[in-house]
């Protein structure tokens, strides 16, 4: 299956690594954007100044608890008011999200460091 290569826009900047991983895992641009907008869990990324968001694949409710067998993850970086992000001598525009990587996780991943509430509020203001 040949997937369409995502184009950079005013809202999203796609790295070559993220495009490669999208092809590897069979993820479309629309699905990655959906994970960013409608995530189930949000954590600090393993890279400095990044955020990782997760959306479960086919969640089911068993005995009143939400369960699933696979997860979709997206790691991205958004430019803050005091940050300057450079990409090949081009500054990322205000409110543009740089998508660094995407991946599928088989199973339920353990919760790592959740983002503090005050930082989540600051991110939502952007």
Mark where each language-model region is:
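Ribonuclease/tRNase effector modules and their secretory precursors
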Residues: 1-126
């Amino acid at each position: 299956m040949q997937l369409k290569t995502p184009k950079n826009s005013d809202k999203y900047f796609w790295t070559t690594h993220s495009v490669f991983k999208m092809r590897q895992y069979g993820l479309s641009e629309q699905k990655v954007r959906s994970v960013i907008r409608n995530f189930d869990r949000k954590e600090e990324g393993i890279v400095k100044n990044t955020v990782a968001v997760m959306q479960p694949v086919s969640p089911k409710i068993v005995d009143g608890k939400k369960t699933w067998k696979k997860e979709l993850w997206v790691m991205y970086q958004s430019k803050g008011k005091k940050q300057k992000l450079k990409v090949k001598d081009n500054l990322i525009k205000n409110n543009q999200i740089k998508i660094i990587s995407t991946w599928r996780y088989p199973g339920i991943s353990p919760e790592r460091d959740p983002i503090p509430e005050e930082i989540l509020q600051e991110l939502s203001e952007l």
